[in-house]
From Swiss-Prot:
Interacts with CBFA2T3. Interacts with phosphorylated SMG5/EST1B; this interaction protects SMG5 from ubiquitin-mediated degradation. Associates with alpha-SMA (smooth muscle alpha-actin). Histone deacetylase that catalyzes the deacetylation of lysine residues on the N-terminal part of the core histones (H2A, H2B, H3 and H4). Histone deacetylation gives a tag for epigenetic repression and plays an important role in transcriptional regulation, cell cycle progression and developmental events. Histone deacetylases act via the formation of large multiprotein complexes. Also involved in the deacetylation of cohesin complex protein SMC3 regulating release of cohesin complexes from chromatin. May play a role in smooth muscle cell contractility. It is found in: Nucleus; Chromosome; Cytoplasm. It comes from Bos taurus (Bovine). Substrate binds at residues 101, 151, 306. Binds 1 divalent metal cation per subunit. This is Histone deacetylase 8. Its main location: nucleus. GO terms for molecular function: histone deacetylase activity; histone deacetylase activity, hydrolytic mechanism; histone decrotonylase activity; metal ion binding.
Length: 377
């Protein structure tokens, strides 16, 4: 793996907070789309002994009142009812986005409250000055709307985390590096100039959620405070980092954020079943380092990532980046060791698919964004 000359959190004496408890991991393991992913991620972090270099904080479960800081009472009450009954055929469920990619399985409300509470706990650690970086790898469910589940997301923990951080920090920057557009977070803050959302994502006809073109810039007082970077298939580390750094450099100057929420969905990584981008953890790690050098209060979230072993590889590598640690290439022996065959290494090799992002189109998008950011005051 790439060498780190100095810790990414150099100058920050406080260790990162790592949101974890066995109970929390067990609840997150139950999500049907990513079964046991939370355990795989934590076990690999533990196998590299990274947990010993972080402050482990047990998450609280979100209260109904905390969840209602964004979601409607009607949606939360319906989610709770179908969760208790395990009723996936309730006639009102379609209205609330439940079914198909968000099935109303038994216990889903408890899962949503656990994830929401974990991200709120992480945000509170930053508010309390307990750390400069707080990590909730099982968070980052960025598609949920205030009254609707969407795209495997039942509760928008990212929005709840931002709302909690707003109690202390005046201007919050949300950066979303998931394969999919962070539409739920953008929608939540599309009318405000206090939260800027930046999303790099695949934008292609028929690809979920279908929003996030470069011309989508926010509304009303929030006009120009939504930044969307549409990307085509097969992008690799070097070009992705060039785009990310170019955008974030301009965003930082224009917006002057006081805290950052960073969603690091691993469905961009080569080998993901989404079969779209062609990234490795090293490329995402460079983007992460760029943000960490601002030395702002930073809340780190997971998100997508459907090749479970590669997602664990990615988030473990990124945890190492946060700690300024170079990790051994060889996967240590641990509970899920056999999932990392046939090579049993931390590195992920990109495929040979050609990058479909034409340099002149990329430059057009960057110029458009730079022009829009001139309106940010």
């Amino acid at each position: 793996m790439e060498e780190s000359e100095e810790p990414a959190d150099a100058g920050q004496s406080l260790p990162p907070v790592y949101i974890y408890s066995p109970e929390y991991v067990s609840v997150c393991d139950s999500l049907a789309k990513v079964p046991k992913r939370a355990s795989m991620v934590h076990s690999l972090i533990e196998a590299y002994a990274l947990h010993k270099q972080m402050r482990i904080v047990k998450p609280k479960v979100a209260s109904m009142e905390e969840m209602a800081s964004f979601h409607t009472d009607a949606y939360l009450q319906h989610l709770q009812k179908v969760s208790e009954d395990g009723d996936d055929d309730h006639p009102d469920s379609i209205e609330y986005g439940l079914g198909y990619d968000c099935p109303a399985t038994e216990g889903i409300f408890d899962y949503a409250a656990a994830v929401g509470g974990a991200t709120i706990t992480a945000a509170q650690c930053l508010i309390d000055g307990m750390c400069k970086v707080a990590i909730n790898w099982s968070g980052g469910w960025h598609h949920a709307k205030k009254d609707e589940a969407s795209g495997f997301c039942y509760l928008n923990d990212a929005v709840l985390g931002i709302l909690r951080l707003r109690r202390k920090f005046d201007r919050i920057l949300y950066v979303d590096l998931d394969l999919h557009h962070g539409d739920g977070v953008e929608d939540a803050f599309s009318f405000t100039s206090k939260v800027m959302t930046v999303s790099l994502h695949k934008f292609s006809p028929g690809f979920f959620p279908g929003t996030g073109d470069v011309s989508d810039v926010g509304l009303g007082k929030g006009r120009y405070y939504s930044v969307n970077v549409p990307i085509q298939d097969c992008i690799q580390d070097e070009r992705y980092y060039h785009i990310c750094e170019s955008v974030l450099k301009e965003v930082y100057i224009a917006f002057n954020p006081k805290a950052v929420v960073l969603q690091l969905g691993a469905d961009t990584i080569a080998g993901d079943p989404m079969c779209s981008f062609n990234m490795t953890p090293v490329g995402i790690g460079k983007c992460l380092k760029y943000i960490l050098q601002w030395e702002l209060a930073t809340l780190i979230l997971g998100g997508g990532g459907y090749n479970l072993a590669n997602t664990a590889r990615c988030w473990t590598y990124l945890t190492g980046v946060i700690l300024g640690k170079t990790l051994s290439s060889e996967i240590p022996d641990h509970e899920f060791f056999t999932a990392y065959g046939p090579d049993y290494v931390l590195e992920i090799t990109p495929s040979c698919r050609p990058d479909r992002n034409e340099p002149h189109r990329v430059q057009q998008i960057l110029n458009y964004i730079k022009g829009n950011l001139k309106h940010v005051v």
